[in-house]
Structure formats: C-alpha cells, structure tokens
Amino acid sequence: MAGGEAGVTLGQPHLSRQDLTTLDVTKLTPLSHEVISRQATINIGTIGHVAHGKSTVVKAISGVHTVRFKNELERNITIKLGYANAKIYQLDDPSCPRPECYRSCGSSMPDEFPTDIPGTKGNFRLVRHVSFVDCPGHDILMATMLNGAAVMDAALLLIAGNESCPQPQTSEHLAAIEIMKLKHILILQNKIDLVKERQAKEQYEQILAFVQGTVAEGAPIIPISAQLKYNIEVVCEYIVKKIPVPPRDFTSEPRLIVIRSFDVNKPGCEVDDLKGGVAGGSILKGVLKVGQETEVRPGIVSKDSEGKLMCKSIFSKIVSLFAEHNDLQYAAPGGLIGVGTKIDPTLCRADRMVGQILGAVGALPEIFTELEISYFLLRRLLGVRTEGDKKAAKVQKLSKNEVLMVNIGSLSTGGRVSAVKADLGKIVLTNPVCTEVGEKIALSRRVEKHWRLIGWGQIRRGVTIKPTVDDD
C-alpha cells in the first residue's frame, strides 16, 4: 500500500477508492462499483485439448500472457494454472450496434473512457470484471485442471477449427466440468482463419453432435480467431449476457481456497527486508480485510512417533491484498486474490500451500484423514485415443487397497480404498484435507502411466483430526 491513512487505498488513484472505516459488507454486491473497479467477481475457466488456443484466447481478451514459466514457453503448453483478469466495458450510446459496443481491457485500466468508434458518442463503462483460470489441456496435467475447476463459475470450451472434434482431452474436460456442476458454458470454435467455410460448417455439426446430452448442450458456439482477435468482442458480449454473476455470500466468515502460493523474496535479500509468503486463491464466501487475523488449515502436516498424521494450523495476519496489480483494502468472493501474510515464506514457496484453506480464526471446517463417500463411476475411460472405431476401455469397479488420486477443492492427494460396498467407499488419504461433508470430489486412476478421470463422489462422513496448538 502506498502509505497514507490506514484503511484507505491510495495505490492506483484512477480506480474506485476503498475505505475500511466506512465498509458495510451487507451493502456489497458482486457488481458494486468499489469492488469491480479493483478486483474480478466471477471466475471463468478455459478448457479444451492441448494447443487448441486456451491461453491465446485469454491473452486476446485480457492482454495478459498467462504462460509465465520458461519450460512452458519453450514447449508452448500451459503447465501450472495461468490466470489473468479482464475488465469488460459497454458503450452507453444506444445507437452503437452490437457487438462493437463491447470492449475488454486489462484489470488496471480506468473504469470508463471515451469512445473511439467513428459516429458514436458517450463513454465505455465498466460492466464486468472477470478472472480467467487458464487450465492446461495436456493429458498428464489433468490434476491441475481439476484443481482449477474447483474455483470456476463458468467455462469457455475451446475447440480448434482445424482438427476433428472431439479430441481426447476435450471430452475428459467436459466430463470434469459436469462433475463440478458448471452450468454456464460458451463454446469457442477457434482458429477459424485456418479453415475454409465448408470445413467450419462441418465441424460446427460435429460440435453439436458432441455436446448433445452433456451439460454443454444448447451452449452458444462462437467462431473466433484468437490470434487475429476476430469476434473477441462477441465473446465479451456473451460473457455479459449469457453468464450470470453468481450470488455471493458477503456476510459469513471469510474462506479462501488456495490455488497458488509463492515466496516473493529475491535471493540474497537482507533479513530485515524479508516479506511473508503470498497465497493466491479465490474467496468462496465472506470478505477478507487488510489487518485481519487468519488461520490456515490443515497447516503444517507431520507424523508423530507412531506414524499418525498430525496437523498444526498456521496463524497469521493479512498484510496486503491485491488483485493482479491493484491494491485492495478488502477482497470479496470471486476472482483470484493475492493475500500477503506474515507466514514464513519457505512454507509458501513453489505452490507448497496449494489445497489449503485460509480464513477467519476458528471458523474453518474440519480436517479429514479418512473419507466415506458415495461415488459414481464413468462407464468408459475418457481422454484416451482409440484406434479406429474401437470403444474406449470400460472403467473397472473400485477394488480394496487400490490407490486413487483424489481431488478435493484445489488439493490433489493420494487415497487408498480401504472398503467398498455398492456405491459407497472408504478412502484413507495420504494428506489430510480441510473440507466439509457434502463436498464433491473427483477420482482418478492410474491407467498406462497416466492419471485418468474415472468418476466422482460426495463426502458423507469421515475421520477427523484436531489441529495441535503450540503451548508457548
């Protein structure tokens, strides 16, 4: 924060001012101007097969290149969850035809600016602030995609126009978002500049046949070229018109699901200048404020002398809040938020805190080490290329003592099946997880050296452990 009175944001003076002293959370909405001026309130995931243009679409809408890491740039694939915020504006001149009256910019742009379209007058005004969760499309990275699905409110399904539909990961991702109960989907037929009109129409029919009977049935199909930014304003218009802003809970105790964490200190930094770790994630409910005391669960996990799992919650204080480059005094649900804390940075470096839950002290859910779930298995394996017209392999039933990968919220952990009966199963988790009864979980099994989505479950009950507290 750039100095000044406590509790008032002074960074980015061209954005709406936030004042903690006059904050009344009961009056906030996901479209309150002081909220969407600085942070996104809706999360949109990009899903689809590898190299179909997910990251390029995010760049076309937000101006942010989500591929950040050297090995990602070299191989031109997304490996970690990318993220970018974008503001969507609408021109207040009714004579301007659609879709030209919609425009998108990065999150630090002013909230209104004059029109530059010939023959129109008025200003472009901010109508939505969205956060894109850019998921990897590679089959080895399915776990990362499921972690991203935990925070999505809607999805853009990308299908490249120059390849047949569906590709293996397209169907696997679509199954994953059905599990996560995502209702709002836009289908983008990308790379339209590379194909002739006849091919595009043929593929349009393929897409319609592919989504029939799935959660994406009836979703709008928009032909675009992300590289040439063709039809991107139509995507913006559909985001505003077709994707409702989800109802949010501003008054409960805050809870944030961590999907990234980092140590922001440079090597060789002086001890006095060290900053605490930063956790990045999406607030599920409540409002986080600068200066608030927080707890992170499960926290530090260890084993006692008998090999039993123990957890120690991490307590800290929020030093700063930010959404991309915008300082915040308080952060509302939705959108990806960075939380600067006083936690030892070594606990946060390189995404070590992913899967943890951060919230108000004493108000977080239980920590589970074993889960009893009611589960549902897919009939056939998805995401595997099959020769010719052979059908994919059937999903075998769960067997006792087999090891699965379990995705709960943003945590991927191993789990050993300890008992199975009809559609109920007991799973002993490798890592403890902070979650609640009724939460959805995704199950994956190792097939030919890759983790493959095989089904999902719902937590019915489980074995919990109490976090230990230091005596000092």
Curated annotation (Swiss-Prot):
One Pfam family, short name please?
GTP_EFTU_D2
Catalytic activity as recorded in UniProt = GTP + H2O = GDP + phosphate + H(+)
Which positions does UniProt annotate for GTP binding? A51, H52, G53, K54, S55, T56, N190, K191, I192, D193, S225, A226, Q227
In terms of superkingdom, the source organism counts as Eukaryota
Q: What's the name of the protein? A: Eukaryotic translation initiation factor 2 subunit 3B
tr-type G domain ranges (all copies): 39-248
- The keyword Nucleotidyltransferase is annotated on this UniProt entry: no
The similarity annotation says: Belongs to the TRAFAC class translation factor GTPase superfamily. Classic translation factor GTPase family. EIF2G subfamily.
Note down the stretches annotated as region G5.
225-227
Under CDD domains, the record lists:
eIF2_gamma, eIF2_gamma_II, eIF2_gamma_III
The lineage is: Eukaryota, Metazoa, Chordata, Craniata, Vertebrata
G3 as annotated region, ranges: 134-137
Q: Which Gene Ontology molecular function entries are recorded, alphabetically?
A: GTP binding; GTPase activity; translation initiation factor activity; tRNA binding
Q: Where in this protein does the record put region G2?
A: 76-80
Query: Where Phosphoserine occurs along the chain?
Result: S16
Name the GO terms of the biological process aspect: formation of translation preinitiation complex
Task: Identify the stretch(es) annotated as G4.
Answer: 190-193
* InterPro entries, alphabetized: EFTu-like_2, eIF2G, eIF2g_C, eIF2g_dom_2, eIF2g_GTP-bd, P-loop_NTPase, T_Tr_GTP-bd_dom, Transl_B-barrel_sf
Outline what the protein does.
Answer: Member of the eIF2 complex that functions in the early steps of protein synthesis by forming a ternary complex with GTP and initiator tRNA. This complex binds to a 40S ribosomal subunit, followed by mRNA binding to form the 43S pre-initiation complex (43S PIC). Junction of the 60S ribosomal subunit to form the 80S initiation complex is preceded by hydrolysis of the GTP bound to eIF2 and release of an eIF2-GDP binary complex. In order for eIF2 to recycle and catalyze another round of initiation, the GDP bound to eIF2 must exchange with GTP by way of a reaction catalyzed by eIF-2B.
Q: What is its EC number?
A: 3.6.5.3
